[in-house]
Swiss-Prot record:
Gene, per the UniProt record: ROT1
Taxonomic source organism: Candida glabrata (strain ATCC 2001 / BCRC 20586 / JCM 3761 / NBRC 0622 / NRRL Y-65 / CBS 138)
Alphabetical keyword list: Endoplasmic reticulum, Glycoprotein, Membrane, Signal, Transmembrane, Transmembrane helix
Record-given protein name: Protein ROT1
Gene Ontology terms: cellular component: endoplasmic reticulum membrane
Sequence intervals crossing the membrane: 242-262
Membrane topology (Lumenal): 22-241
Function: Required for normal levels of the cell wall 1,6-beta-glucan. Involved in a protein folding machinery chaperoning proteins acting in various physiological processes including cell wall synthesis and lysis of autophagic bodies.
Topology feature Cytoplasmic, residues: 263
InterPro entries cross-referenced by the UniProt entry: Rot1
Length: 263
């Protein structure tokens, strides 16, 4: 009972509303399987990597950058074999207003969404750019009295609480805080409040068509590669490799020794 009371006192004492410094870090939902950073999105090959379980993660830096990783699955009551899944990546700058409102301004050209509806898309997932400004009416951080960990509670624009997020990393685990996939003619972040498809430019349109043809499996195929980096090196096809040189040297030294002994 004393321990519970202590945690309760700590949570009340540690309750902070609207303090940007307390946002710093990587926060993850209860599943503890979704985290921002290179384990969720590969900006080089533009691959979204499917976590083991659904969840959401936010990261914040001291200089005003944020990153979001979301993996949501919604069931289909009429057909349980047809759940819809969505993977979303965004990053950009955040703004904290005087009234405690937190606004996330994503970089327009960097957001990505992979949407899968197996009973409607014939097994072909849709991969598009994504740009969604997010507004949180307020937030607070505190020590959870049950788990004893730092907790971030975000409140939606209407005041409804989101599921709590728990501190996973501090400093945060994030991709570089800069535009990752710049395009010609891009002018920075212009949030629209809704998801967007590829640019209307012909080259981007062609790229979008190609991406849409890829399956979910193809987009997440590098999951294990990214999580468990290999230390393998490229094998040389030349006969003059290290093993050849070593055995040749050994043979020559041995032959020379025999000649010296017999002479």
């Amino acid at each position: 009972m004393v321990r519970s009371l202590l945690f309760a006192l700590l949570s009340v004492a540690g309750l902070v509303a609207g303090d940007a410094a307390d946002l710093v870090g990587t926060w993850s939902s209860k599943s503890n399987q979704v985290f921002t950073g290179p384990g969720f999105y590969d900006p080089i090959d533009e691959l979204l990597i499917e976590p083991a379980l659904p969840g959401i993660s936010y990261s914040f830096t001291e200089d005003g950058w944020f990153e979001e990783a979301s993996y949501q699955v919604s069931g289909n009551p009429k057909n349980p074999a047809c759940p819809k899944a969505s993977l979303i990546y965004q990053h950009g700058k955040f703004e904290l207003l005087d009234n405690g409102t937190l606004i996330l301004h994503p970089i327009e050209v960097d957001g990505r969404q992979l949407f899968s509806d197996p009973c409607s898309d014939n097994g072909i997932s849709t991969y598009t750019r994504y740009n969604q400004t997010e507004v949180f009416k307020s937030f607070e951080t505190f020590i959870d009295p049950y788990h004893g960990v730092y907790t971030l509670q975000l409140y939606q624009f209407n005041g409804a609480p989101l599921p709590p997020l728990y501190l996973a990393y501090r400093p945060p685990m994030m991709l570089p805080t800069e535009t990752l996939n710049p395009t010609d003619g891009s002018t920075g972040s212009h949030p629209t409040g809704s998801s967007e498809s590829e640019s209307q430019e012909s080259d981007d349109t062609s790229k979008r068509s190609l991406l849409k043809k890829r399956s979910l499996r193809e987009h997440v195929k590098r999951s294990l590669e990214n999580r468990y980096k290999t230390n393998a090196v490229k094998k040389s096809d030349s006969i003059f490799n290290a093993a050849f040189v070593w055995y040749t040297s050994f043979f020559l030294v041995g032959a020379g020794s025999l000649i010296f002994i017999s002479s």
